[in-house]
Amino acid sequence: MASRDTTRPNIVFVLTDDQGCWTMGCAGNREIRTPNLDRLAATGTRFENFFCASPVCSPARASLLTGRIPSQHGVHDWIRAGDTTAKYEKDRNGELVEYLAGMTGYTDVLAAGGYECGLSGKWHMGDSHHPQKGFTYWNVHVKGGGPYYNAPMVDGDGTYEEPAYITDVFTDHALEFLEAQSASEDTPFYLGVHYTAPHSPWSRDQHPAETWDRYHEECPFESTPDGLKPAEWVERLGIPVKDAETRRSHLSGYYTAIELMDANVGRILDWLEAKGLRENTLF
């Protein structure tokens, strides 16, 4: 059975992608549905003053994993080469590069200490083809982001496209890992569930229509910060973000992605509670 030793608790780490701190009920947002994130906040600790090492995906993730700032670990921007992307998109002809080679991640330490480590979801720190940093279970997204349906994935058999909604699939794989741990001896586990949600795309065809339509038709989005200056690349590429309908469409997909991610967090919490492991699992 997974660990019931209170000195060696199990660990579940959920990482979302591009989620604003205002997008939860526990943060005062009355329009979005996040009962499970609110449930965690009510029984745990919610930081109100928190700083990220980088506003960009790959360096921020590398900092979380290594405890180092970008100038120390060397990843300064989102990775477009040397990753599985280079091999998946044949025209790039790039080699696979493990950008954090030679650096210790906290999952390395956990694995060395006897933890069984599993990762389901987004990696985006180089060479997604091969398990790294102490992980023995490895079912990850090929790229740094992409479609919610037919998402490119990699497992032990190579790359494939997943037809189902990818947020659900990440959780399916996470529960597969947990089930295997529940059948093992008293070994603590670490599970990383790295959702691509709520990163774009946000169009209706990328998400379950019923939820997208509910937000599009019913939500005033008054809880969403407005009037912020768009990122430089948004202005440079001329991406429309200021007209009312474009804003409503984007936010409908954004809120949908968060609500459905929250529902999947609930699936993991429910599994832990059903197995009697919730009290001995850091979440």
Language model regions located:
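Short, polar loop motifs at secondary-structure junctions
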Residues: 123-126
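Short aromatic-enriched loop/helix-cap "lid" or pocket-rim segments at secondary-structure transitions
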Residues: 52, 62, 129-133, 149-151, ...
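Secretory-pathway/luminal and periplasmic proteins that interact with or process carbohydrate-rich
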Residues: 47, 71-73, 129, 198-204
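Active-site-proximal cap/lid insertion segments
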Residues: 3-9, 16-32, 142-282
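Active-site segment of extracytoplasmic enzymes that catalyze sulfate/phosphate-ester chemistry
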Residues: 13-14, 20-118, 137, 143
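Extracellular/periplasmic catalytic domains that process cell-envelope and extracellular macromolecules
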Residues: 4-8, 33, 39-42, 56-58, ...
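Short, structured coil segments at secondary-structure junctions
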Residues: 133-134, 175
